Design a protein with these regions (language model features):
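Stable alpha-helical elements in mature extracytoplasmic
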Residues: 4-7, 16, 20, 67, ...
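Short, solvent-exposed loop/beta-turn-alpha elements that line the ligand-binding surface or hinge
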Residues: 21-37, 80, 122-153, 202-203, ...
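A conserved catalytic-core signature of glycosyltransferases
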Residues: 59-61, 66, 177
Length: 221
């Protein structure tokens, strides 16, 4: 399966698919490559009894694509963009320096929100963010100081970027909304997933070097 948990659930007990667990049990040599996969991903592809119902192919990993030529011209080292605060500083320099119209493009999706927290080993909700058999029952924003401070800092940066017109939001139609802006030079960076790589390279068409930064953290921690 490739997709979110709810997509897997639609097929897990249908007559169209055979549960993968039987094949796993028959494999006497084990599945070492799966054992090294992030445990939360594995859990998301199991039923409530812990039996695996699918293999998570095509899983998305987030990062920030950037116009390497533009950042170099602005004197910005992409390796130093490690947090939301660093991203804000880079956007200020890019926009106020006249290098581009928008510093970064954002997709306001919880996936990126949780990924930024995950860079610091934090989760916004209890019970492993609901990835196991136990459902989420509590938001940790008001219960855990580290979670509160990380979320507050991240949302504060979001707010400043929008208020100061340093960023542009995009939705699910990223190929029409943000990739053309980056290809034209109107946007220096955008937050996306690795599956977007070919599309941005095709859009840039060699006009500039495209780079990608691993997902940044919510704070400087």
């Amino acid at each position: 399966f490739s997709g979110p948990v709810e997509n897997v659930a639609m097929y897990a007990n249908s007559e169209y698919c055979t549960p993968l667990q039987g094949f796993i049990d028959a494999d006497s040599q084990g599945w070492p490559e799966l054992e090294s996969t992030w445990e939360a991903i594995r859990t998301a592809y199991c039923d409530n009894e812990g039996n695996q119902v699918g293999y998570p192919v095509g899983y998305s990993y987030p990062g920030i694509y950037y116009n390497a030529d533009m950042l170099a011209e602005a004197g910005i080292d992409p390796k130093e963009i490690k947090s939301f605060n660093d991203l804000y500083d880079a956007c200020v320099k890019l926009v106020e320096g006249g290098y581009t119209t928008y510093g970064v493009g954002f997709h306001p999706d919880g996936f990126y929100f949780n990924a930024a927290l995950g860079r610091e080993g934090l989760q916004a909700y209890n019970n492993n963010n609901g990835l196991g058999s136990e459902r989420i029952t509590e938001c940790l924003y008001t219960k855990d100081t580290k979670v509160h401070d990380a979320i507050y800092n991240m949302l504060d940066v979001y707010q400043k970027l929008h208020a100061e017109k340093l960023c542009v939001a995009y939705g699910s139609d990223y190929q029409a909304e943000v990739i053309p802006q980056m290809a034209s030079g109107d946007c220096a960076m955008f937050m996306g997933v690795v599956s977007m790589t070919t599309k941005i390279l095709d859009a840039a068409n060699g006009a500039f070097e495209v780079g990608i930064i691993p997902m940044i953290s919510a704070t400087e921690a």
